[in-house]
A protein has these predicted regions:
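Short acidic/glycine-rich loops and adjacent helix/strand connectors
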Residues: 1-160
Length: 160
């Protein structure tokens, strides 16, 4: 029996998902605890609630996955800023701040809250995270061939 924790935070609604033996078993949005609509902070309360509910320990957790690759995002924001620096500065500077204070500190949060081994922190491709979410919530497409088309603003630089 192994558990995988999925975490989304720092940009949109923060949330935590728990997968047990490849099946999504639970999901919580941080706003359920903070009562702040669209809360983007690290979902500490949701994470602690689910860890307690399922009695999760380091030995039971196979991985803790973040929904993007922060260093890839960093390089994309940098390239984006260089193309039109004066027009993009306001957007890029706020994204850099979010990235620096958020995504890059993901493993610090999991270590502090879960006492999780560093090698259990994984970073998923952003658009793959969207696609897997679609599969998890639509039982009609389970175990079938499928094409999932993700349209997103920036993601991992794979945007059309």
């Amino acid at each position: 029996m192994s558990y995988i924790i999925g975490i989304s935070s720092f940009y949109h609604d923060s949330s935590v998902a728990i997968v047990k033996d490849n099946i999504l078993i639970d999901y919580l949005k941080e706003e359920s605890f903070t009562r702040i609509k669209g809360n983007s902070v690290f979902p500490k309360r949701s994470l602690l609630h689910l860890v307690k509910k399922y009695n999760l320990t380091n030995s039971k957790i196979q991985a803790c996955v973040f929904y993007e690759k922060p260093f890839l995002s960093w390089s994309i924001i940098t390239l984006f800023s260089l193309k039109k620096p004066f027009e993009r500065w306001k957007i890029s500077s706020s994204q850099f701040k979010k990235l620096w204070s958020g995504s890059l500190s993901f493993s610090t949060h999991t270590k502090k809250i879960l006492n999780l081994d560093e090698n259990k922190n994984l970073y998923a491709p952003h658009h793959m995270s969207h696609a897997l979410t679609a599969i998890s919530f639509d039982k009609k497409i389970e175990n079938k061939d499928r094409l999932i088309f993700v349209i997103d603003a920036v993601g991992d630089g794979e945007t059309i």
